[in-house]
């Protein structure tokens, strides 16, 4: 079967975990793994799996006679901002796993169909990938005046990049809750959970809804969208049934629905408690396969 060719740029934990997922894809061939450190564990693992591994960076990749159809960038925002124009000039679609956010934000279960031909898409944040689908599930049934999410991730799964960009996480995720999730106002909070042993990613979503909203329809929509996410993130699950609260004197006449999630990683390379990272590589794979379907269809 013909497959779209892909390169992973960035041989760290994210890039390596992504490689294992792409190796299972029926329509993407991860042909290249690109890094800058010859001693990288990711490059060694790539070579062991038959993936062409190079520590000579993007210059080396783009100088090849054969080039990828899709690039997955798992480096840094700074590096991706430099590389993105070069990919675009060569007609290579880019899936951005960095905070650069140069292209439209994509959550596969919500808006992938709108961006299949985009030259560059970004995946927002791990908290956004986990919680925006739930806000969308509610907002497609009724108005959501306000949505607030709390993402709790195991402290060992949060590297220096995450810790240095907490403000960026909250701003970017809050924006996605509004623009993709459909809430009129969104707020995001992240907690680095120091518990030992490390716990799975846990997310809480609260949505303010009209007092007369159809609660059965909202519950059904939540389960439907959760199943859509679970199709590409098997460890994504509801921890309990959605909980509804009636209006109170301080809620301005609005009711509330609470949604409680857990994300367990697949354990491809990262430990299962790193569900926050696994949901990013799983979403990247799903987006890449959507790109590949478009690319292969156009080449027939």
Curated annotation (Swiss-Prot):
List the InterPro entries hit by this protein, alphabetically: Acetaldehyde_dehydrogenase (IPR003361), Acetylaldehyde_DH_C (IPR015426), NAD(P)-bd_dom_sf (IPR036291), Semialdehyde_DH_NAD-bd (IPR000534)
Pfam families with a match to the protein in the record: AcetDehyd-dimer (PF09290)
**Which top EC class is given?**
oxidoreductase
Which residues does the annotation say bind NAD(+)? Answer: 11-14, 157-165, 276
Q: Which Gene Ontology MF annotations are present?
A: acetaldehyde dehydrogenase (acetylating) activity; NAD binding
- Decide whether keyword RNA-binding is in the record: no
Q: Keywords of this protein's UniProt record, alphabetized?
A: Aromatic hydrocarbons catabolism, NAD, Oxidoreductase
**EC annotation from Swiss-Prot or TrEMBL:** 1.2.1.10
Per the UniProt entry, what are the Gene Ontology biological process annotations, in alphabetical order? catabolic process
Which SMART domains does the entry link to?
Semialdhyde_dh
Recorded superkingdom: Bacteria
* Catalytic machinery residues: 126
Q: Which reaction does it catalyse?
A: acetaldehyde + NAD(+) + CoA = acetyl-CoA + NADH + H(+)
Family to which the UniProt record says this protein belongs? Belongs to the acetaldehyde dehydrogenase family.
**What is the recorded name of this protein?**
Acetaldehyde dehydrogenase 5
* Classification lineage: Bacteria, Bacillati, Actinomycetota, Actinomycetes, Mycobacteriales
């Amino acid at each position: 079967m013909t497959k779209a060719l892909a390169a992973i740029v960035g041989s760290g934990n994210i890039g390596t975990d992504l490689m294992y997922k792409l190796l299972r894809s029926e329509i993407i061939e991860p042909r290249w793994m690109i890094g800058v450190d010859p001693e990288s564990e990711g490059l060694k693992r790539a070579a062991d799996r038959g993936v062409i591994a190079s520590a000579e960076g993007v210059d080396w990749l783009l100088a090849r006679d054969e080039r990828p159809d899709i690039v997955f960038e798992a480096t840094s925002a700074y590096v991706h901002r430099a590389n993105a124009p070069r990919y675009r000039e060569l007609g290579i679609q880019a899936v951005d796993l960095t905070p650069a956010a140069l292209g439209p934000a994509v959550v596969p279960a919500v808006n992938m169909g709108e961006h299949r031909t985009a030259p560059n898409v970004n995946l927002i944040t791990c908290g956004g990938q986990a919680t925006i689908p739930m806000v969308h599930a509610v907002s497609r049934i009724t108005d959501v005046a306000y949505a607030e999410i709390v993402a709790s991730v195991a402290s060992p799964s949060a590297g220096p990049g995450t810790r240095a960009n907490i403000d960026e996480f909250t701003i970017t995720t809050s924006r996605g809750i509004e623009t993709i999730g459909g809430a009129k106002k969104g707020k995001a909070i992240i907690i680095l959970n120091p518990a030992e042993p490390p716990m799975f990613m846990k997310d809480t979503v609260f949505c303010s809804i009209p007092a007369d909203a159809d609660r059965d329809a909202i519950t059904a929509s939540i389960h439907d969208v959760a199943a859509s996410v679970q199709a590409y993130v098997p460890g994504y699950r509801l921890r309990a049934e959605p909980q509804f609260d009636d209006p109170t004197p301080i809620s301005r006449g609005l009711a509330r629905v609470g949604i409680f999630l857990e994300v367990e990683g697949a354990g491809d390379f990262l430990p299962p408690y790193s569900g926050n990272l696994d949901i990013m590589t799983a979403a990247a794979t799903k987006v890449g396969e959507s790109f590949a379907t478009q690319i292969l269809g156009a080449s027939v």
